[in-house]
Amino acid sequence: MSKAENTSGKQQLILRLSADTSDSLEWLIWSVSRHQTLTTGSGTLESLQAVLADYPVISARVLVPSTDVTFHTLSLPRQSRRQLLQAIPFMLEEQVASDIDQLHFAVMDMHGDNATVAVVQKSRLRAWLNQCETLGVPVETVVPDVMALPRADSAWSAISHRNLWLFRLDSGIGMAAEENWYQSLLAFQPLPAVHCYSPVPASALTWQPQPVTDLLTLAAQVNLSMSMDLRQGEYAPVKPWKQALLPWRNVLIALSAWLLLVLGESVWTHYQWYRQADYWRQESVRVYRKLFPDEKQVVNPRAQMQRHLQEVRAGVSGFALTEQMNRLQQLVAQNEGVSLQSLSYDRSRDELRLSLRATSYAQMEQFRQQAQAYFQIPPGEMKQEKDHVEGQLTLRSQP
């Protein structure tokens, strides 16, 4: 079969890293559509990159040696599981040999209330992840190689790989032992049924043979749960959409800051408008009360003022209010030394009441004489202050 035929469809890389980054890598290119191996090999990272040039892959399943990982089983009740997950390092502090600050803890599996926890040195995990990043292939998952073995109820799974025996126990934890002493390890604990995916050793009379395969092929075929990924917590992979946004991070930050400024300015502007509207509403009420002091309830000054104007136009009031207000405005404008302090309208008496301030008696008298051309003005009060004169005038319409 030609290479073009082999590489048609989707391919996935199954990669096993070594304990030492200087050691050779192992890989297998798996055809997802045909469920078969396209090529296998071992060597350096550079040699693998050369292979990937001929066999492009969509993703990689990465296995790391279980000899660098320890497994523990903890009881995590469902009611408080979220809180206990954060406390796992302290729960295992007495069982690990290193400082927990130097260790990474990842939950591999949950079975009822029991959790399988993998512990690995942070420095070792960072080295593996750096290799994956250098390779440049999207990583589907990073798991201890023993987790590629199927988990069976009341039975172990076993496979031989490079002078190591890998065991996955029915509890979910894993073990790795060299071929020359694995029997001694197993002799110290009761042994259930063992499903063996390698040729069964002659001494293992109770082991149950399974279809013989190799570790990388088994890892390609098995359904690896995403929960078994060692990349948890601070090492959790960045989601693709977040990765795509990283180049735009500074632009998005600047845009967010600008939007916040615009929003803040808009909120402040609307608040100022509200303050101004409230001020003028109160001012209109104040002016209306001065014009119509007999009215105790002012709900809508504008509507109430329009009602009064309509009554005036209809002849309800004998005092032509609008015309007289225009004349009063002209009088104030003609006498610059006189200022109007307050104005009120007594509807029952049909008269305007003014409170005036002038710089002298002469100016106040001049204003009064000019106003007499349009109004009846009974004697009013005037008093001299330190630097001005204050007066009260009542204006009534001419008969």
Swiss-Prot record:
Residue ranges, Periplasmic side: 265-399
UniProt keyword Protein transport, yes or no: yes
Disulfide bonds: none
Keywords: Cell inner membrane, Cell membrane, Membrane, Protein transport, Transmembrane, Transmembrane helix, Transport
GO CC annotations on file: Gram-negative-bacterium-type cell wall; plasma membrane; type II protein secretion system complex
Signal peptide: none
Entries under InterPro entries matching the protein: ATPase_NBD, GspL_cyto_dom, GspL_pp_dom, T2SS_protein-GspL
Primary localization: membrane
Subcellular localization: Cell inner membrane
UniProt topology in membrane: Single-pass membrane protein
Residues on Cytoplasmic side: 1-247
GO biological process, one term: protein secretion by the type II secretion system
Subunit structure: Type II secretion system is composed of four main components: the outer membrane complex, the inner membrane complex, the cytoplasmic secretion ATPase and the periplasm-spanning pseudopilus. Forms homodimers. Interacts with OutM/GspM. Interacts with OutE/GspE and OutF/GspF.
Family, as annotated: Belongs to the GSP L family.
Purpose of the protein: Inner membrane component of the type II secretion system required for the energy-dependent secretion of extracellular factors such as proteases and toxins from the periplasm. Plays a role in the complex assembly and recruits OutM resulting in a stable complex in the inner membrane. Provides thus a link between the energy-providing OutE protein in the cytoplasm and the rest of the T2SS machinery.
Protein name: Type II secretion system protein L
Organism the protein comes from: Dickeya chrysanthemi
Gene name, Swiss-Prot/TrEMBL: outL
